[in-house]
């Protein structure tokens, strides 16, 4: 089942669901919001599908028309945007067979002291990212991106700050979670995401990684309820006007990863800070495909498009650059 949120004519949230790509979406009767439905399921010991079924479905919704009209909202929002957390992890994907062979060769043949920190982290994932049942795997790279104020709706612009040196896409899968009143994390499902980052800043010094990730992100338009397919294959492209300036396949799913989703989830939610009742988490799981690696420099007005057939409509966002702001701290 695919679930999304749409802005109604009076500013209300309309929750839309459909069984899969190609099916007609329908509004959930008195849905309220995906957050409201998910919290009812989490706190009531029910599945999200059963909560939706109990509400019933109403009018049909043309999602392509909604997209064209710019009425998609992020597929989950929180009544208080500060309680939606955007986070991510990286160095989790094997990439293509050639990339995998190359990285294996580098990590197995090179002396430990000659490996970069990134390569060491990748090697740790290869060796310990998929633990046996009942065991804990190695912890991955982790970073903070922001909160709900940094969540750009599908179809909206990803706004790069004026001081940024780059604004580039990262096509990823994101896990979508709510925290029940007893502190238990519940996964709604997975969505396409663009973990928009400043790769030039990151490249200056890896200690700038934290700075480079403090950028908006977008996810959706639809959440695929349930577990993720083992082998996820999609396409990432960038359009400049009528021209496609970058297009490349990207892979995800555990068949193409050095970690299990469960291991990555554990190392996020093991922190009590991230199990505050009522909070929402959007956790992005990394990628092996970047236009930056191909020498592409996106410009204002370019459109990022990420698509995977099983996850519904593609995720599209344009690139915009914010005007310079004067920021000065004042003494009270």
Predicted features along the sequence, with ranges:
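Gly/serine-rich nucleotide phosphate-binding loop at the start of the catalytic core
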Residues: 2-54
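Active-site microenvironments in enzyme catalytic cores
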Residues: 6, 43-242
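Short beta-strand-to-turn element immediately C-terminal to the catalytic PLP-Schiff-base lysine
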Residues: 16-19, 87, 176-178, 320
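Short, solvent-exposed amphipathic alpha-helical segments in soluble enzyme
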Residues: 18-22, 101, 206-208, 299
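Catalytic-pocket segment enriched in acidic/His residues
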Residues: 7-12, 191-193, 197-332
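Structural motif
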Residues: 22-23, 172, 312
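Surface loops and adjacent helix of pleckstrin homology
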Residues: 29, 96, 309
